[in-house]
Amino acid sequence: MKKIYLIGDCHVSRVSEHYGKNKVTPSLVDVVFWGKAAKSVWNLDFKKMYEEEELSSGKEEQLFYGDGIIPFSDIKDDGILLLWFGYVDVRTFLSRYDNADEVAKRYIKEIVNNFKNSTIVIIEPLPQFTEMILKYEGISSHYTYQQRLNQNKKFLDSLHKYAHDAGITNFIFQSEILDAVGVKELTPDMTHNKAPHPVDGLKDEYNSKILDLFIKKSLELLNDWS
């Protein structure tokens, strides 16, 4: 059975809830999800995460205790690896430190050094919401939409440069994510209300469509193998 691994921040946990519910997942493919809330590119250390068996956050809506929680050691270097990091960096840190190039360079280095046998697919970070929603709870500093868009562009420009230099050519673009959910930008009315305070997490209907996009892209790569 072909393996697809999807790792990233809390948005991976959210889309994972729709695995098995969508119509594009064939029985010959096994998808493993590892998503960690607030996981930034800057704090990625795949070797350490593997050795310490760092646990994922699990699903936001758990059907049972520990639903979706797995150690990072379950992520093997033997299939298609989709990486969906960078949202946290763009939202919270890059406007403050203005080090998008360094962050992107470290990201690619971590991938290349730790996943030599995988087919790599880099998913561009979830596009920023027009409002910095977490500011309402004091969870994060507040940066304007334009500030975050500027840092997003810097990060993506550097990310593609270093990926190209490393021979990584498979990407899922922010424009494809927006097309999948049928909008030009992400707005507060698209967020779910499952938490007691506003969160920058999309409603189920959008996460389901995003997962469909990821699976379809992965299946295209699997077809190229056969």
Report residues per predicted region.
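Oxyanion-hole/transition-state-stabilizing segment in secreted/luminal serine hydrolases
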Residues: 66-102, 126-135
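Hydrophobic beta-strand segments of well-ordered beta-sheets in folded domains
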Residues: 2-5, 29, 78-82, 118-123, ...
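Conserved catalytic region of serine esterases and O-acyltransferases that act on ester linkages
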Residues: 184-226
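Substrate-gating cap/lid alpha-helix
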Residues: 132-175, 195-208
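Active-site segments of SGNH/GDSL-like serine hydrolases
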Residues: 84-90, 112-150, 175-181
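Serine-esterase "nucleophile elbow" of acetyl-processing enzymes
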Residues: 1-53, 73-74, 81
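Surface-exposed cleft-lining segments at the edges of enzyme active sites
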Residues: 54-62, 88-105, 139-150
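A Trp-anchored, charged/polar loop motif used as the substrate-binding/catalytic surface
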Residues: 49-74, 106
